Amino acid sequence: MILSLCVLTPNRIVWDSEVKEIILSTNSGQIGILPNHAPIATAVDIGILRIRLNDQWLTMALMGGFARIGNNEVTVLVNDAEKGSDIDPQEAQQTLEIAEANLRKAEGKRQIIEANLALRRARARVEAINVIS
């Protein structure tokens, strides 16, 4: 058995292929999804999507959204997504350092919230590169 995985952003289809298994970051933690998974709809957190193709694992940074799982089909609708292989490691690390600096100097609730979100997005991108398969 296999799963049909489709990852969509408002602007493009990031992934549309069959996979063996996925591990999805949700607002309540990570969930593993195998064929014949119970039907659910869940919020997707800023984090990593791990995709197993045969014996190889791929990663993708997801920027929040939601997912629908049912009938061996997984549809993930997110604000943005990047394959780990498409992320420039130096640029991602620089973005992370800038986000950390911005959080340290943030003042007021709004700035702190925005800086925290930017930091979480930057960490997800770095993690998508550094995940050991």
Curated annotation (Swiss-Prot):
One cellular-component annotation, GO: chloroplast thylakoid membrane
Signal peptide stretch: none
GO MF annotation list: ATP binding; proton-transporting ATP synthase activity, rotational mechanism
Organism name: Populus alba
Biological role stated in the UniProt entry: Produces ATP from ADP in the presence of a proton gradient across the membrane.
Gene3D superfamilies on file: 6.10.140.480, F0F1 ATP synthase delta/epsilon subunit, N-terminal
Location in or out of the cell: Plastid, Chloroplast thylakoid membrane
Organism taxonomic ancestry: Eukaryota, Viridiplantae, Streptophyta, Embryophyta, Tracheophyta
Subunit structure: F-type ATPases have 2 components, CF(1) - the catalytic core - and CF(0) - the membrane proton channel. CF(1) has five subunits: alpha(3), beta(3), gamma(1), delta(1), epsilon(1). CF(0) has three main subunits: a, b and c.
Protein name as annotated: ATP synthase epsilon chain, chloroplastic
The UniProt record lists the keyword Repeat: no
